[in-house]
Amino acid sequence: MSVDETTVRRIAHLARIAVADEDVGPLQGELNAILAFVEQLGAVDVEGVEPMTSVTPMRMKKRADVVNDGGRASDIVANAPETEDNYFLVPKVVE
């Protein structure tokens, strides 16, 4: 797959990037080099290779999914000028 000037301009338009006319050619070359590299990656034989999610084997620490207030409500509202029952009090905006 190769990228032409029209495709470079379309990508720039979709990304909302202003590209000067003199920059279209170099960008075309860079995008074609990236696509060539991706095509090389597709040719790599990965038969029998287990997918990795991390470079070191580790298990995720899991906890029970429980709804709670975190036990820190008083710490959260401690710096608020006014509070009531662990809620922030703010001035009325609409009468």
Swiss-Prot record:
One of its GO terms (biological process) is translation. It catalyses: L-glutamyl-tRNA(Gln) + L-glutamine + ATP + H2O = L-glutaminyl-tRNA(Gln) + L-glutamate + ADP + phosphate + H(+); L-aspartyl-tRNA(Asn) + L-glutamine + ATP + H2O = L-asparaginyl-tRNA(Asn) + L-glutamate + ADP + phosphate + 2 H(+). Keywords: ATP-binding, Ligase, Nucleotide-binding, Protein biosynthesis. Its EC number is 6.3.5.-. SUPFAM superfamilies: Glu-tRNAGln amidotransferase C subunit. The keyword Phosphoprotein does not apply. One of its GO terms (molecular function) is ATP binding. InterPro entries: Asp/Glu-ADT_sf_sub_c, GatC. Allows the formation of correctly charged Asn-tRNA(Asn) or Gln-tRNA(Gln) through the transamidation of misacylated Asp-tRNA(Asn) or Glu-tRNA(Gln) in organisms which lack either or both of asparaginyl-tRNA or glutaminyl-tRNA synthetases. The reaction takes place in the presence of glutamine and ATP through an activated phospho-Asp-tRNA(Asn) or phospho-Glu-tRNA(Gln). PANTHER family: GLUTAMYL-TRNA(GLN) AMIDOTRANSFERASE SUBUNIT C, MITOCHONDRIAL. Heterotrimer of A, B and C subunits. NCBIfam families: gatC (TIGR00135). Belongs to the GatC family. This is Aspartyl/glutamyl-tRNA(Asn/Gln) amidotransferase subunit C.
